[in-house]
């Protein structure tokens, strides 16, 4: 029961979270490529994501913009990108303000908080539902706020 001047209380079960990782990319048209898995990210996992999820969707006019995560700079990743003939760029260090995907993650995390997922096995499905909420107008706004489009 809630009332005026009473603290809102929401019960959350105490558990030890497991590490769920999402690798993702967004495009100006609202299309997202992503993969979800348990555990941390390695250069091998990132290369697999590029090979199976992102690179098959790109045209020669597309540009991949990445932050400076260590695995983005791995030799195997750079060799894969070079062999694909895709253009790729790295953001300056510590520049989340230039990365539209940071804004996408803000929206997705807000969605996940509202979903109140408490069982790890339900998280991948909730993440997929969250990606369905991303619209082209969102992406245009995020890219515009980072000065990639007018």
Model-derived features with residue positions:
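Extended, low-complexity cationic-aromatic segments
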Residues: 1-51, 148
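Short alpha-helical elements
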Residues: 52-53, 65, 79, 116
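C-terminal anion-handling pockets and recognition modules
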Residues: 32, 101-150
């Amino acid at each position: 029961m809630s009332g005026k001047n009473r603290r809102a209380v929401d019960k959350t079960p105490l558990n030890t979270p497991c590490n769920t990782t999402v690798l993702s990319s967004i495009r100006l048209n609202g299309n997202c490529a992503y993969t979800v898995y348990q555990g941390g990210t390695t250069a091998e996992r990132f290369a697999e994501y590029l090979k199976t999820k992102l690179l098959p969707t790109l045209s020669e006019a597309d540009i991949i913009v990445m932050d400076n995560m260590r695995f983005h700079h791995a030799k195997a990743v750079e060799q894969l990108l070079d062999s694909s003939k895709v253009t790729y760029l790295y953001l300056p260090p510590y520049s989340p303000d230039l990365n539209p995907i940071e804004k996408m993650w803000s929206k997705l995390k807000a969605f996940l908080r509202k979903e109140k997922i408490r069982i790890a096995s339900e998280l991948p499905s909730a993440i997929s539902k969250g990606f369905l909420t991303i619209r082209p107008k969102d992406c245009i706004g995020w890219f515009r706020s980072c000065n990639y489009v007018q």
